[in-house]
Curated annotation (Swiss-Prot):
It comes from Staphylothermus marinus (strain ATCC 43588 / DSM 3639 / JCM 9404 / F1). This is Large ribosomal subunit protein eL37. Binds 1 zinc ion per subunit. One of its GO terms (biological process) is translation. It comes from the Archaea. GO terms for molecular function: rRNA binding; structural constituent of ribosome; zinc ion binding.
């Protein structure tokens, strides 16, 4: 089998993300070794940005 379209069908077999040990969300990338939600495995600090929360009346709420 080559590297083109036939091999793309093999991508859906293994799990990309598993449950994270720190945040509990289903966002820990097995291949890269870090969580996409909280940043576990990449940094000690929890990944959190202000744009993750909705703004109401020009004031950012949690």
């Amino acid at each position: 089998m080559g590297k083109g379209t036939p091999s793309m069908g093999k991508h859906g077999r293994s799990k990309t993300h598993i449950r994270c040990r720190r945040c509990g969300r289903h966002a820990f990338n097995v291949a890269k070794g870090y969580c996409a939600a909280c940043g576990f495995g990449r940094s000690k600090r929890i990944r959190r940005y202000s744009w993750q929360n909705k703004k109401v009346n020009r004031i950012r709420i949690r």
